[in-house]
Amino acid sequence: MVKFTTFLCIIALLLCSTLTHASARLNPTSVYPEENSFKKLEQGEVICEGVGEEECFLIRRTLVAHTDYIYTQNHNP
């Protein structure tokens, strides 16, 4: 009886470990998930749903300023 109980415990542990391992793996939607957002930004599509026209303009201007700062911060004139 002890051997049978030990065998069942080992099988249960193996089953739990394989199920945990299988459920932890996620299928990636894309290798580069930010790729779509970069394309939208390059095309000038900034989503401003529920925001006024002035606020949308401010968001775009801030985005351009941050991008300009990122790409020019290491340049020495």
UniProtKB/Swiss-Prot annotation:
Residues 25-68, 74-77 form a propeptide. The keyword Mitochondrion does not apply. One of its GO terms (molecular function) is growth factor activity. Sulfation is important for activity and for the binding to a putative membrane receptor. PSK-beta is an enzymatic derivative of PSK-alpha. Expressed in stems, roots, mature leaves and flowers. Most abundant in vascular bundles. The modification Sulfotyrosine is found at Y69, Y71. Its main location: secreted. The keyword Secreted applies. It is found in: Secreted. One of its GO terms (cellular component) is extracellular matrix. Promotes plant cell differentiation, organogenesis and somatic embryogenesis as well as cell proliferation. May be involved in the low quiescent center cell proliferation. This is Phytosulfokines 5. The gene is PSK5.
